[in-house]
Amino acid sequence: MEVARTVRIPHAFDGLTLSRQATMRRTLFLIPHEFAGWPIFGIGWALLFLLIAVLAYVGWESRRGGLGASTAIRQIAGFAVMAAVILVVVVPRTELVNTLGDPVGVAVRGYGMFLMLAAIASVGLAAWRAERAGLGADSILQLAPWTFIGGLLGARVFYVTQYYEDFLRPTWGETLMAMAALNQGGLVVYGGFIGGFIASLIALKRHQTPIWRIGDVIIPCVFVGLLFGRLGCLMNGCCYGGACEAGPLAVQFPAGSQVHAEQLLSGELLGIEGHPVVSDEEPPAGQSQMVVDSVRPDSLANQAGVKKGETLTIALDPSYRDQVPLDRPAEEALPGVVVLRDDEVVARFSPRDLPSIADPVWGTQIISSVFAAIMFVVLLIVERILHRPSKQTDDAVTERAITGGRRPGVLMLVGFIAYGVLRIVLEWIRVDEKGQFGTSLSISQWVSLVVIAASLVTLFIRWRGVDSTSEQTPGGGNTNVVGGSDAAAAGL
C-alpha cells in the first residue's frame, strides 16, 4: 500500500516569535559549564555548595541544642545523597554541547519553568481548597507526588508511543536516553491526565480518601496547571496549529523553530506550492520530495528557476553549524536549504538568504490557555450553584464543605467533558498528529470521545443515583457529609 511521503524534521530547533516585534525563546538562560576553571556540575561548585549547606545545617542543629550532630546527619543524609547523585551523575548528562561536542552548559528551558509554575500554582490552590472542604491540606500534599510522577510518566509514554520513530538511535542505550530526555520537551497532556489519574486513584485508595470529593477539589486546579503548561508549550515552540491568516489568534515563529523548518521543507517559505511525492518509503529526516504545482513570482524559488510540474527534493543543510561560536550550544545553529532536481543542485540558500520568520499559524497554545482560564472561572461558578443551601441541608456545613455537596463528583465530570470538547476542537486546527484507525481523527480526539462518553454516563448515574447527603465509602457504607456528624466523606 502506498502512502504519501511526510516531512520529518530533526529535533533541536530553538525559540519562537509571537510577532515581528515580540520574541520568546525555548531556552531562558544557560548555566555555564564551568566557573573560574572549575565545572559547576559533576565534581564541582554545586557539589561543594551542597556539602557546605549540609555541614552548616548539622552545625546549626548541634549548636541550638535541638538535635545532636549524629541525629541531624541521619535526618539529612538521604536528601544529601540523592541531591549529590543528581548533581554529579544526572545533571551533567543534560548539558548541551557545542559543534565540537564539548559541554557548554545546562539550559534552563521556558517549558520546564512553566511546568514548575503549573505545579506550584495548582498544588497550592488545591491544598487551600482541600482545607476549606474539610479534607485537610495534607490530603493534597500526600497525593501530589503520586500525581506528578504518574502524570510525568504517562505524558512521556504517550508522547514516545506516538512519535517513537523520532527516538530511535543506533543503540538501545542511546534510544533510552533520547526517550528520557525531558529537557528537550515532548509531553502529551492526555497522557499526563491518564497517568496522573491512575496514580491518584491508587494513592486515594491507599489513604482511604474520598475520591469524588477530592476530585471536585482538584479539577479547577487542573485548569490552572493547564493554563501555565500551554504557555510552556508556546515557549517551547510545540503544539502549534496549521497555517492561517495573520490575526490576534495567530503566532509566528522565527528561524530555528520547528514550524519554520516544516515550512521550509514544504516549500512554503521558498514560494512553492506543491503536493508530496507518493512512495512506500518516507524520506530521510530533514528532507521532503514534492511535485511543484505553482511558484510565486517574487519568491526565492522563482529566482532559482524552479518551474511548475518539476519534482524536487528539498533538504535542510546543516553545513552552517560552524558559524555558531564555540561557547554556544550547537542547537543554536540555523540550517540552510538545498533544492535538488534529479539529484542535481538547483539552488542552495544560506540561513541569511531565507526568511527570518515563519508564516502565521494558529496559536493553539494561547487558545488552550485562555480556555483554561475561562473554565477555571466557570467551574467555580458551577460549584457555587451546586452548593447553594437548601431546606434539607445544614447551611453552615454546606457552606464549609465547598466540594462534594449534594452531588459529589459532578464538578470533576463537568471538567472532564469540557476538556474533551476543547481537545477535539483544537485538534482540528493542529497539524502535528495524523488520523488514526482509518479516520481523520487523531489519537487525542479518539481519547477525547471516550472521556466525554464515559463522563456523560457517569454524570448521569451520579446525578440520578447519589443521595443528596451522603457518599459511598470504600467499604460500601455511607458517610454523612451535610447535616450529619462527619465533616469528611469517604470515597468510592
UniProtKB/Swiss-Prot annotation:
It is found in: Cell inner membrane. Pfam families: LGT. A 1,2-diacyl-sn-glycero-3-phospho-(1'-sn-glycerol) binds at residue 230. GO terms for cellular component: plasma membrane. GO terms for biological process: lipoprotein biosynthetic process. Keywords: Cell inner membrane, Cell membrane, Membrane, Transferase, Transmembrane, Transmembrane helix. The keyword Cell inner membrane applies. InterPro entries: Lgt. The chain crosses the membrane at residues 40-60, 72-92, 106-126, 133-153, 184-204, 214-234, 361-381, 409-429, 441-461. It is a multi-pass membrane protein. Disulfide bonds: none annotated. This is Phosphatidylglycerol--prolipoprotein diacylglyceryl transferase. It comes from Rhodopirellula baltica (strain DSM 10527 / NCIMB 13988 / SH1).
